[in-house]
């Protein structure tokens, strides 16, 4: 009998130790609900412990009647329960703006969502993609955020639009942007004005003609206009406040410190852009992976220098492999991402890959670029 008692005591002690372990900082962590696997992969392992805390079932308590009636239950290990999305996964602070290592770069804008929130592009709604089940081109990036999250100015300037009707240029409750703000900034690029757009807000906190600084609250994230859920639609426009004058915001938003941006140009054997192609990026050292689509159409505004059809920002500096398949052939190319810089890759189905930069445009060539109210080919 005594021997059996010692066995019971030993088993109970072991259960207690296991319970303590599984609820400790070294134990299991709950993965927040709706966090994409890619984002988990892109988080440094040593930082996961600060992001995902132990899950403890505080509701698993017994009433006094249960205790008086001799209610007994073995110590249970509480499995993680999906929680709310984290405020932000680990990311370094941004480079100060304006930031440009080369004369071809123009990281002039800070993020329109503060650093304590998710403030990077939603992977499935990048610039140049088609809206789902349509042939309408997405002319900005979408940043997922909780409803009510402050939307802030990406750079100093003057509010030239605040309200509903941005696309039509006049009040229209059916406007796809919903409640939106446009800022004309104090600076330009190549003697052309720069503007930024903030769409789908639930509330606007500024008015037309108002002066704003970097970080001024413009309103709050919402779900107005053509939107399937709360998020911020952000655009960069060149010269005029027109849907047809957009550029890829990922080439204009300052990257996190120590991180860089991949810019690509993929063409087929006929020298035509390869559209809507899945391109995979893999960090050789950490094995982290990303997938980005090339632009959906030839009729999309590209950077005047890079003439890209692929952009993937916020990549930690390091060695990478790019791969994609076309006409049953898989192509691979190793390249480097450098801190605070753009890494350019071109591919032609006839000649293969190259990391050689495009030739510089002369001032005369820049002046000859035609700006029309239609997408440039």
Regions found by a protein language model. Give the residues of each.
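Short, acidic Ser/Thr/Gly-rich low-complexity loop/linker segments typical of extracellular
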Residues: 285-309
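N-terminal Sec-pathway targeting helices
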Residues: 1-13
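Short histidine-centered loop motifs in beta-beta connectors
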Residues: 146-148, 152, 189-215
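A residue-level detector for short acidic-glycine micro-motifs
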Residues: 161, 200-203, 220-223, 268
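Surface-exposed, glycine-biased beta-strand/turn segments
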Residues: 45-179, 186-188, 214, 227, ...
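Conserved, short, structured surface segments that act as functional micro-motifs
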Residues: 171-185, 208-259
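Hydrophobic core positions of the immunoglobulin-like beta-sandwich fold
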Residues: 198, 312-313
């Amino acid at each position: 009998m005594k021997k059996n008692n010692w066995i019971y005591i030993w088993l109970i002690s072991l259960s207690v130790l296991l319970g303590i372990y599984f609820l400790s900082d070294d134990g299991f962590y709950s993965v927040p609900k709706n966090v994409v696997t890619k984002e988990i992969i892109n988080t440094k392992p040593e930082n996961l412990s600060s992001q995902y805390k132990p899950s403890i079932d505080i509701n698993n308590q017994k009433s006094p009647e249960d205790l008086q009636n001799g209610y007994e239950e073995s110590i249970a290990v509480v499995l993680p329960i999906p929680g709310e999305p984290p405020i932000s996964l680990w990311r370094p602070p941004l480079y100060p703006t304006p930031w440009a290592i080369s004369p071809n770069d123009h990281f002039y804008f800070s993020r329109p969502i503060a650093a304590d929130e998710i403030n990077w592009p939603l992977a499935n709604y990048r610039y140049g993609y088609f809206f789902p089940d349509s042939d309408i081109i997405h002319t900005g990036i979408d940043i997922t955020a909780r409803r009510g999250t402050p939307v802030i100015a990406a750079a100093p300037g003057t509010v030239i639009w605040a309200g509903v009707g941005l696309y039509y240029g006049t009040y229209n409750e059916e406007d796809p942007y919903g409640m939106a703000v446009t800022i004309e900034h104090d600076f330009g690029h190549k003697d052309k004005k720069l503007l930024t757009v903030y769409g789908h807000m639930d509330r606007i906190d500024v008015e037309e003609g108002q002066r704003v600084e970097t970080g001024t609250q413009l309103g709050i994230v919402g779900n107005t206009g053509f939107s399937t859920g709360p998020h911020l639609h952000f655009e960069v426009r060149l010269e005029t406040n027109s849907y047809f004058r957009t550029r890829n915001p990922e080439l204009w938003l300052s990257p996190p410190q120590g991180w860089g941006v991949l810019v690509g140009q993929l063409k087929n054997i006929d020298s035509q852009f390869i559209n809507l192609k899945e391109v995979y990026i893999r960090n050789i050292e950490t094995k982290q992976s990303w997938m980005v689509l090339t632009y959906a159409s030839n009729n999309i505004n590209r950077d005047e220098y890079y003439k890209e059809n692929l952009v993937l920002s916020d990549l930690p500096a390091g060695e990478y492999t790019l791969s994609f398949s076309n006409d049953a052939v898989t192509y691979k190319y190793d390249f480097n991402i450098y801190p605070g810089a753009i890494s350019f890759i071109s591919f032609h189905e006839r000649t293969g890959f190259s990391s050689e930069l495009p030739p510089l445009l002369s001032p005369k060539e820049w002046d000859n670029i035609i700006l029309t109210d239609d997408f440039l080919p």
